[in-house]
Amino acid sequence: HQEARRQRQMCIRDRSGAIVANGSLRQVKAAFDYGYNMGLAFQIIDDIMDYSSSKTKMGKNQGDDFKLGKTTLPIILAWEKSNKLEREFFLKSLQELKQEKGDFEKCCEILKKYSILNRCKKIANDFVIKAINALNEFSENDYKKALIELANNSLSRDN
């Protein structure tokens, strides 16, 4: 999947930077951990945006993941909370791709009913905290501050 590839690229890039800078093994691992956790947070925010952002903000159509039948974190968490009828709806809409007009809106209603997007934001925030904590292996400098700022800003991005 493209999401997994993006996450691996972030990990490799961040780990490579520590290696090139002659970082200790702990710093190389910390750089990997930063990239890994940022990749997860970034993907979760992207998943949230599919159900909450407009095309002008996001650069892609709202509901594209739903229309393609992608099982993203919001769908997984909604499935866990859903009753029998809601699960049947998800199976029809996402697994069988038998979607009707209004199904995306129905999905959004289910997500809202169970506060799924808020739960996803909390999970993304937890990954951002892990990413920032990984930077404790590095001394205070402008680069570290920029990485922390990037991590914090990733939670409020809208594209």
Question: Model features per residue range: what roles?
Answer:
Residues H1-I12:
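Single conserved hydrophobic/aromatic residue that forms the stacking wall/gate
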Residues R5-R6, K29-D33, K55-K81, R87-D126:
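Divalent-cation-assisted or electrostatically stabilized phosphate/pyrophosphate-binding catalytic cores
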Residues M10-R13, I44, E100-D103, F127-K130:
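Amphipathic, well-ordered alpha-helical segments in soluble domains
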Residues A18, V28-T56, T71, I75, ...:
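Active-site alpha-helical segments that house and flank conserved acidic catalytic motifs
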Residues L25-V28, K84-F90, S139-L150:
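Acidic/histidine metal-binding catalytic segments
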